[in-house]
């Protein structure tokens, strides 16, 4: 049982759309024993909502602008999530910073994907920053969510070469291909019980993963 939270127009938004479109009677990609119970966005015009609705998945909008504090917003978000009793919360471009109370509540059962090779380029505008820094490699990272922004324990990373003529848009498109590959893999591992967070360390099949997680080879 998973819940997807898309927000805003970001590259991760396409992931939420891909998840919703690939569901057949609630089963992701036909190979993961899981169902999406609810898709939540904080923006009413989020494309992921329409895609989820088309796939027959329940949706809900919780507008953060209607709340007087981050704590109040997170409390309502928690109520909506817990009503479905999910095993896993999947963030897909949800561009809000959570309170420590929220991240603690879902410790070990909330995943996020970030368009950089963490710990490099946390936050926004990662592709522009990668080009400006003249790095040789860029990519995407799947990690468990913690109270530190884009700083939770690493699960899986995929890299791409940064080419001399790359624009941020071109580089983002190449990274997005890798995002589409590695996020479903990480979700599948979690749903199969192979991927766990224990004492703030990531275990895969009972074995401790390196600090940078598994390096994906396509």
PLM feature spans:
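Donor/substrate-binding cores of folate-linked one-carbon enzymes
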Residues: 29, 42, 88, 92-205
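A general structural signal for well-ordered alpha-helical segments in protein cores
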Residues: 16-17, 48-49, 74, 127, ...
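Short amphipathic alpha-helical segments
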Residues: 18-21, 51-53, 101-104, 123-124
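Short, basic/aromatic-enriched C-terminal tail that caps enzymatic domains
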Residues: 199-218
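N-terminal glycine-/serine-/threonine-rich beta1-alpha1-beta2 phosphate-ribose binding loop
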Residues: 30-84
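N-terminal Rossmann-like dinucleotide-binding module
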Residues: 1-47, 51
């Amino acid at each position: 049982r998973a819940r997807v939270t898309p927000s805003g127009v970001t590259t991760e938004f396409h992931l939420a759309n891909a998840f919703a479109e690939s569901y057949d009677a609630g089963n992701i990609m036909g190979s993961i024993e899981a169902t999406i119970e609810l898709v939540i966005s904080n923006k009413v015009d989020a494309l992921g909502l329409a895609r989820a609705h088309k796939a027959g998945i329940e949706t809900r909008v919780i507008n953060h602008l209607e709340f007087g504090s981050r704590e109040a917003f997170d409390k309502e978000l928690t109520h909506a999530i817990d009503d479905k009793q999910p095993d896993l919360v999947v963030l897909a471009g949800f561009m809000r910073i959570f309170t420590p109370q929220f991240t603690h509540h879902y410790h070990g059962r909330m995943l996020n994907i970030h368009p950089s090779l963490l710990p490099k380029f946390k936050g926004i505008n990662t592709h522009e920053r990668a080009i400006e820094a003249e790095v040789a490699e860029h990519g995407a990272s799947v990690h468990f969510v913690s109270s530190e922004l884009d700083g939770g324990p690493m699960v899986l990373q995929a890299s791409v070469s940064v080419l001399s003529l790359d624009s941020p848009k071109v580089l983002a498109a190449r990274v997005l291909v890798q995002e589409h590959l590695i996020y479903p893999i990480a979700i599948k591992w979690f749903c199969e019980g192979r991927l766990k967070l224990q004492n703030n360390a990531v275990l895969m099949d009972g074995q401790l993963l390196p600090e940078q997680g598994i390096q994906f080879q396509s």
